[in-house]
Design a protein with these regions (language model features):
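Flavin-dependent oxidoreductase catalytic core characteristic
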Residues: 1-120
């Protein structure tokens, strides 16, 4: 029984290391995409109001200011991008990046005939 737990623990440790590596790799991408999209949405909302979108009479001006700060918190998106390219892509000997690309390839292959996810 003791060996069984140790064997399972080894597999759990491998899974944990894999998932930790994916989180490390993808965090800068998720942060940048989310914060950039939030600002773009608010920017378009201001455009729909015309010049009045900048007035405090409408909440969209506050939303825009609030969304801009997302790209600054936890390191600006540009700093995160430099960290991704300079450090995280090659982290763990590039294994995290290779694992992600392998998973992405499997996903693409599995969904190649999907009406929405497949090729146009």
């Amino acid at each position: 029984m003791h060996q069984d737990r140790r064997g399972r623990r080894g597999k759990d440790d491998e899974k944990a290391a894999y998932h930790h590596g994916q989180v490390e790799l993808l965090t800068p991408l998720v942060k940048a995409y989310g914060s950039d999209q939030a600002f773009r949405v608010c920017e378009l909302a201001i455009q729909t109001y015309g010049g009045a979108g900048y007035l405090k009479d409408y909440p969209v001006e506050q939303y825009c200011r609030d969304s801009k700060i997302f790209s600054i918190y936890e390191g600006t998106n540009h700093i995160q991008a430099m960290d991704l390219v300079g450090r995280k892509l090659g982290q763990n000997g590039g294994k995290n990046t290779q694992a992600f690309l392998g998973d992405l390839g499997k996903f693409i292959a599995a969904n190649s005939e999907h009406p929405v996810l497949g090729p146009p």
